[in-house]
A protein has these predicted regions:
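Serine-hydrolase catalytic core recognition
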Residues: 362, 499-501, 509-514, 518-862
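Beta-propeller folds
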Residues: 2-530, 536-538, 545-546, 555, ...
Length: 862
């Protein structure tokens, strides 16, 4: 009996001639039986040889595949790897990330921006959107310009160059005025300064819409009448280094309150100046060592060894910690229309704050009449914020609006309110409850005279910025995320509550659906989900409204101008794709994937995965090492669709890892009640919960090779996660860079906002102390990195954590850098190389040698 395959139905059937005969004679039956038996044996022998031969061929093929995998390393690389691995030097050179000077509207007609050829250009909407060069690329490159300000008449451009960092947001710099018509440079220096060399100044800006200058030097403010004038008028006289600051913030205010290098605001016509004075005389002092190491002091000019100073000197900083005195602040208005006879007026804080500690969060002029300023104050606990309106001539202030935090929460510091021209109403950002538990940042409209408050934006998404209030057309333009897509950012418009139209009109997203409003430009923005925008100022019917739309990702950045009424594309201003895509194209780049993971109490973590270039959905049995970057700082956001090429991109490309970023409870757009008065609890546990979910659901993640790292607050979270000890089985090792260890020694403004005062929440401070968990960190699993001149998270934190680890006999790796601040800018290549080396050993990552061998083998196979 034979078996064969039916070609049509793919079934086994009996041949038609294999039938059973009955009633034949014995002789005939015997003869026929012998013949059939002989034929059957011959066929069976032939089939067995065929089967054996087929098995040998299959075995050889399988052996070849196994050998290829063993020799080359990864079968997926042979099949799918395109481009070369990114090198760290290529990342740090900065050529892969587009950099551009900021752009701005100078008037309703003129928009200044840096074009693709590097020049500073100006677009004129009144001249058929023509673009002319204001400053050539050559001029900008000669000075290595890092910032600029144009005078309103476009006759001068103020350059900022040769920046030297002081604090995180503040710096000293050289300032140069460029005369546009004469193509001439005018260095900015004070009258008494030497003329032979440029002078480092703390801040320089134009005085309102004039060509007069405001200069801040040694914590005092000076006035210069014109760019060509060499004489100055001193406006303040109280400045003291490290103690009293006029017109610029002290360390705490630039770090966590104003987050800006300046604290002065000039009136529209330049006749009045509003400025803040910060007094740190009662603030405690922090000391840190200063070695003054440089290549010359150690190696000498010819490379020969020279002895460094035997002992380091020390530097000091006024650094307020929780429960200790904070800086006092005063707000002043000075009339500088008569520069020879200055009049000063002190702006008083609200009565509710007079006998309490408080912060100044923002200030500014209202309208163009120089008769009103607005000020936003917040109490020390940061659960009560008051907006004041101060009126000329005595500048007496009245309270116009109060915001109070919900129970078990705090108030986030927001941008300054946007006022109507008459000052009778304004817009502000505030937390608004959506649903039973969740709150989101939305726009409130406050009418001062009628004491009416209306919420203008709604929904389960975050408003991040109010762009412009067009009081002529009664439209408000703002930026916000899209519901269920918090990593995106879009341009929205909503009507204000005008008297002509009392109906409530829902906000409308301009960029969410490119097939709708932006139909004509949908192909230009097809790889854009993260936008910013700049709307032209408009104060009467004579000017047409326009907006410049900036695509910031996930594709390469570009920008174009649109008509605000029809949304028609008018002109492309810059497009980085032609210049940057050829550079990126040669690299094996990771793929970005975003998803949500459920958390307790109905919350959902936002997760972003950078999948390595060799990853494919069909490779279900591949197991990739995992590296998680944590931030965790309350109010921060890590998961975004903005274009980025950072160390995570490099690690995914170079070391074939799945790189993960998380936003858990406490992040912007997430509930903050769960971490109020208990830092280091829920947001730390969420890091474990999310990874357990991902490892269970996605089989391509290697459960045995998971690392974690973070910087600053993220470094603190990393130490706390590893400090869970046996309570977590997810993370094998981690790196804390410039971490916070004990919240009693972090800055008062941030810490008290969430934790309260130590005498009111002592238990919370103890439980949040990372040094208390040091004994639970597994040996050889922790790498601590810190700069000894770190002002954000002082070096004391690293020392305390290291001491706790040592006392607990935990073996760990420790690296410190002399004279380096929080960002470790001067040694960043060494830092990244050290981090990569640690994870290569801990997670058994691809080393450069292994990668080189595989790439050489792949080239040979081609």
């Amino acid at each position: 009996m034979h078996a064969n395959v039916h070609s049509d139905r793919n079934e086994w059937r009996l041949p038609p001639d294999d039938t059973l005969q009955v009633g034949e004679s014995k002789t005939k039956k015997s003869e026929v039986g012998d013949e059939e038996e002989l034929a059957l044996h011959e066929d069976e022998g032939h089939n067995w040889w065929s089967i054996i031969f087929s098995l040998l061929v299959i075995g050889l093929v399988i052996s070849g595949i196994v050998a290829a995998i063993f020799i080359v390393g990864y079968v997926d690389e042979l099949l799918y790897w395109h481009g070369q691995r990114m090198q760290l030097e290529e990342l740090l050179e900065g050529d892969l990330t587009p950099r551009r000077l900021p752009s701005s509207w100078l008037s309703s007609k003129h928009f200044v921006f840096q074009s693709d050829d590097g020049s500073l250009s100006i677009l004129d909407t009144s001249k058929n959107f023509s673009v002319t060069v204001l400053v050539t690329n050559n001029t900008l490159r000669q000075l290595n310009v890092k910032g600029y300000q144009c005078s309103k008449d476009l006759s001068y451009v103020l350059f900022q160059h040769n920046l030297k960092s002081v604090f995180r947001q503040s710096f000293t710099a050289h300032y140069t005025i460029y005369d546009v018509s004469k193509d001439h440079h005018i260095p900015v220096r004070l009258e008494a300064s030497p003329k032979a060399q440029p002078e480092r100044l703390q801040y320089v800006t134009w005085l309102g819409d004039t060509t007069s200058l405001l200069i801040v030097f040694n914590n005092d403010i000076y006035h210069r009448k014109s760019p060509t004038d060499e004489s100055d008028t001193r406006i303040t006289f109280t400045g003291q280094p490290d103690i009293i600051y006029n017109g610029i913030p002290d360390w705490l205010y630039q770090e966590d309150i104003l987050q800006s290098p300046e604290a002065l605001w000039s009136s529209y016509d330049g006749t009045h100046l509003l400025y803040a004075t910060f007094n740190d005389s009662q603030v405690g002092t922090m000391n840190f060592p200063w070695f003054q190491f440089n290549a010359g002091s150690v190696l000498g000019s010819a490379g020969a060894y020279q002895r460094a100073p035997s002992f380091p000197s020390s530097r000091t900083l006024r650094y307020p910690t929780p429960g200790t005195p904070i800086p006092s602040v005063q707000l002043w208005i000075v009339d500088i229309s008569n520069i020879t006879s200055l009049e000063y007026h002190l702006v008083q804080p609200p009565k509710a704050l007079l006998d309490l500690d408080y912060y100044l969060t923002s200030a500014g002029w209202v309208g163009h009449k120089n008769t009103q300023v607005s000020v936003v104050w917040i109490n020390r606990a940061q659960n009560l914020s008051i907006i004041s309106a101060c009126l000329a001539p005595n500048w007496t202030c009245i309270e116009t609006h109060t915001e109070r935090a919900r129970d078990q929460s705090w108030l986030e510091i927001q941008e300054h309110p946007v006022f109507s021209p008459d000052g009778d109403s304004y817009l502000l950002l505030a937390a608004v409850q959506e649903g039973s538990r969740e709150t989101y940042t939305h726009i409130k409209h406050v009418t001062v005279t009628q004491q009416r408050i209306a919420v203008l934006s709604h929904g389960r998404h975050e408003v991040s910025k109010i762009l412009f209030w067009d009081t002529v057309s009664h439209f408000i333009y703002y930026l916000a995320s899209e519901e269920n897509r918090p990593g995106q950012r879009h341009l929205y418009v909503v009507r204000d509550p005008s008297t002509d139209d009392p109906r409530r009109v829902e906000s409308y997203c301009i960029t969410c659906d490119l097939g709708d409003v932006l139909w004509s430009s949908r192909y230009l923005y097809r790889n854009c989900t993260h936008f910013s925008a700049q709307v032209s100022p408009r104060f009467d019917e004579s000017s047409s409204p326009f907006y410049v739309l900036h695509c910031e990702g996930p594709g390469l950045p570009l920008a174009a101008m649109h008509n605000a009424s029809s949304h028609t594309l008018l002109k492309i201003l810059y497009d980085t794709r032609p210049s940057k895509w050829p550079l990126l194209e040669k690299y094996a780049m990771p793929k970005k994937k975003s998803l949500e993971v459920p958390l307790p109490q109905g919350s959902r973590a936002q997760v972003q995965l950078l999948l390595p270039p060799s990853w494919r959905e069909e490779l279900r049995d591949a197991a990739y090492p995992v590296l998680v970057e944590v931030n965790g700082r309350p109010g921060s956001k890590s998961v975004t669709e903005e274009f980025q090429v950072d160390w995570g991109t490099y690690m995914s490309s170079h070391c074939d890892v799945v790189y993960i970023k998380l936003d858990v409870r406490g992040a912007r757009g997430q509930t903050d009640r769960s971490i109020y008065h208990q830092i280091g609890g829920i947001e730390v546990q969420d890091q474990v919960t999310v990874l357990e979910h991902l490892l269970e659901k996605h089989k391509y993640l290697d459960k045995t090779r998971v690392g974690i790292w973070g910087w600053g607050y993220g470094g603190y979270v990393t130490a706390m996660v590893l400090g869970l000890g046996n309570q977590q089985k997810v993370y094998k090792c981690g790196i804390s860079v410039s971490p916070i260890a004990d919240w009693l020694f972090y800055n008062a403004a941030f810490t008290e906002r969430i934790m309260g005062l130590p005498n009111e929440n002592y238990k919370g401070y103890v439980e949040a102390d990372a040094t208390q968990r040091a004994r639970n960190i597994p040996k050889r699993s922790f790498f601590l990195i810190h700069g000894m001149a770190d002002l954000t998270a002082p070096y004391q934190h690293g020392v305390m954590l290291a001491s706790a680890l040592t006392e607990a006999r935990v073996l760990y790796r420790y690296q410190s850098y002399a004279d380096e601040g929080h960002q470790l800018e001067g040694v960043i290549e060494h830092v990244y190389n050290s981090m990569q080396n640690f994870f290569e050993e801990c997670l058994n990552l691809d080393t450069d040698e292994k990668a080189k061998e595989r790439e050489e083998k792949r080239d040979e196979d081609k």
